[in-house]
C-alpha cells in the first residue's frame, strides 16, 4: 500500500491491469496523460488546508514502473552496446519495448536513474552514437529541461529512461558520461532499482 498526498493542480487515478492496481499521478495540464482505465481508488479523502488549497489522499496498491514495463515487453530482441566510464564496451541484448535505463540495470551497468524514470533528474544521461541518434523520437520539453541540468551535455545526449528500444536501434551504442550530478543527504547510499 502506498499513500500519496496530492496538492491542488494535480489529480490521480488508480489503474487496474498488468500485475495489479497502480496509482498514477497526472498533472492538471495533462502532461502525463495516457492509459486511463477502470479508475477506482480504494480510498479518497479531501480536506481544506490553510489559504483555501485542497488536497486529496489516495491509498492504493502500487506496482513499480519496471514491473509494469516487463508486462509490455516484446519477445523480439535487439543488440546494443554500452560504453562504460572506463571505455569498456559491454554488448547486451535488450527486448523491444524496454528502456535503456532498465536494460542497463538488468546487466548491472552503472547508469543510476535516481528518480526511477519520473523525469526528475539527469542521472541516466547517455550519449547516443550519431548513426542512431536521429532514429530516436524528438525529446519532449520535460526531457530537454532535465538534459539542461546534465553535466557534460552534448548534441547527442539523451536520458536513458526515455529511450525505448525498437528494432531500428539494433546496433546502437550508448556511452555513459564521465560524471553525473545528483543530490544526496549525507550518508545516503543509492539502491539498485
UniProtKB/Swiss-Prot annotation:
Domain of life of the organism encoding this protein: Eukaryota
Protein's cellular compartments: Mitochondrion; Mitochondrion matrix
Cofactor note: Binds 1 [2Fe-2S] cluster.
Necessary cofactors: [2Fe-2S] cluster
Amino acids binding [2Fe-2S] cluster: 115, 121, 124, 161
Domain 2Fe-2S ferredoxin-type: 78-180
Entry GO MF terms: 2 iron, 2 sulfur cluster binding; electron transfer activity; metal ion binding
Keywords noted in UniProt: 2Fe-2S, Electron transport, Iron, Iron-sulfur, Metal-binding, Mitochondrion, Transit peptide, Transport
Region: Disordered, residue numbers: 38-70
Entries under SUPFAM superfamilies matching the protein: 2Fe-2S ferredoxin-like
Matches recorded under Pfam families: Fer2 (PF00111)
Signal peptide bounds: none
GO biological process: [2Fe-2S] cluster assembly; [4Fe-4S] cluster assembly; electron transport chain; P450-containing electron transport chain; ubiquinone biosynthetic process
Summary of subunit composition and partner proteins: Component of the mitochondrial core iron-sulfur cluster (ISC) complex composed of NFS1, LYRM4, NDUFAB1, ISCU, FXN, and FDX2; this complex is a heterohexamer containing two copies of each monomer.
Function (record text): Electron donor, of the core iron-sulfur cluster (ISC) assembly complex, that acts to reduce the persulfide into sulfide during [2Fe-2S] clusters assembly on the scaffolding protein ISCU. The core iron-sulfur cluster (ISC) assembly complex is involved in the de novo synthesis of a [2Fe-2S] cluster, the first step of the mitochondrial iron-sulfur protein biogenesis. This process is initiated by the cysteine desulfurase complex (NFS1:LYRM4:NDUFAB1) that produces persulfide which is delivered on the scaffold protein ISCU in a FXN-dependent manner.
Family recorded in the similarity comment: Belongs to the adrenodoxin/putidaredoxin family.
Protein name (Swiss-Prot/TrEMBL): Ferredoxin-2, mitochondrial
Organism: Xenopus laevis (African clawed frog)
Amino acid at each position: 500500500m502506498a499513500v500519496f498526498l496530492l496538492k491542488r493542480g494535480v489529480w490521480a487515478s488508480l489503474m487496474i491491469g498488468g500485475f495489479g492496481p497502480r496509482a498514477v499521478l497526472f498533472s492538471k495540464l495533462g502532461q502525463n496523460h495516457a492509459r486511463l482505465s477502470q479508475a477506482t481508488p480504494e480510498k479518497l479523502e479531501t480536506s481544506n488546508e490553510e489559504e483555501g488549497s485542497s488536497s486529496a489522499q489516495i491509498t492504493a496498491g502500487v506496482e513499480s514502473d519496471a514491473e509494469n514495463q516487463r508486462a509490455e515487453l516484446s519477445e523480439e530482441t535487439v543488440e546494443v552496446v554500452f560504453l562504460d566510464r572506463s571505455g569498456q564496451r559491454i554488448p547486451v541484448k535488450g527486448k523491444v519495448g524496454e528502456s535503456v535505463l532498465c536494460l542497463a540495470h538488468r546487466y548491472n551497468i552503472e547508469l543510476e536513474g535516481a528518480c526511477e524514470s519520473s523525469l526528475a533528474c539527469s542521472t541516466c544521461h547517455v550519449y547516443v552514437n550519431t548513426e542512431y541518434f536521429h532514429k530516436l523520437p524528438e525529446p519532449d520539453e520535460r526531457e530537454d529541461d532535465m538534459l539542461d541540468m546534465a553535466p557534460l551535455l552534448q548534441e547527442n545526449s539523451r536520458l536513458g529512461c526515455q529511450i525505448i528500444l525498437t528494432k531500428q536501434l539494433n546496433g546502437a551504442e550508448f556511452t555513459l558520461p564521465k560524471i553525473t550530478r545528483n543530490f544526496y543527504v549525507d550518508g545516503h547510499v543509492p539502491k539498485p532499482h
